[in-house]
Regions:
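Basic, helix-initiating cap at the start of DNA-binding domains
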Residues: 1-23, 32, 54
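An amphipathic alpha-helix adjacent to DNA-recognition modules
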Residues: 9-14, 49-76
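Generic alpha-helical secondary-structure signal
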Residues: 11, 36, 58, 87-90
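Short alpha-helical functional segments enriched in proximate histidine and acidic residues
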Residues: 19, 66, 98
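Helix-turn-helix
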Residues: 19, 26-54, 58
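Residue-level signal for short amphipathic helical patches enriched in basic/charged
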Residues: 40, 62, 102
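Hydrophobic alpha-helical connector segments
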Residues: 72-107
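Short, intrinsically disordered, charge-balanced linker/junction segments flanking boundaries
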Residues: 109-112
């Protein structure tokens, strides 16, 4: 069970990500997410995110920050004038990095 507001927010995000990946963003209700996260208060999602759109934006932003870090590290190794081939390979490597974790795979299923 979450100990504080940050834990609850992370738990809601984790469950939303998993459920969106499995069933689709539009097939999952806010109530299903709060129940899966063990929240008795149905308005927990609105309390932490304001709107469903903010939940989705937060979920996508959370993962994109990690991908931006990986992308920046890989770009730093390419030099000043990377070829198109190198840039395409870099993009493939960035998204392939998601395949190393279950939540990364969930993210790819959502944005697909």
């Amino acid at each position: 069970m979450p100990r504080n507001s940050s834990d609850t927010k992370a738990l809601l995000l984790d469950h939303a990500e998993k459920m969106f990946a499995e069933d689709g963003v539009f097939a999952v209700t806010n109530r299903q997410i709060t129940e899966a996260a063990g929240q008795k208060n149905e308005s927990a999602l609105n309390y932490h995110f304001g709107t469903r759109n903010e939940l989705i934006i937060t979920l996508l932003t959370r993962r994109s920050k990690d991908l931006d870090t990986i992308r920046a590290e890989l770009l730093a190794h390419l030099g000043d004038k990377p070829t198109t081939r190198e840039l395409v390979q870099l993009l493939v490597e960035v998204y392939t990095s998601c395949l190393h974790t279950e939540s990364g795979c969930d993210y790819l299923r959502i944005v697909d």
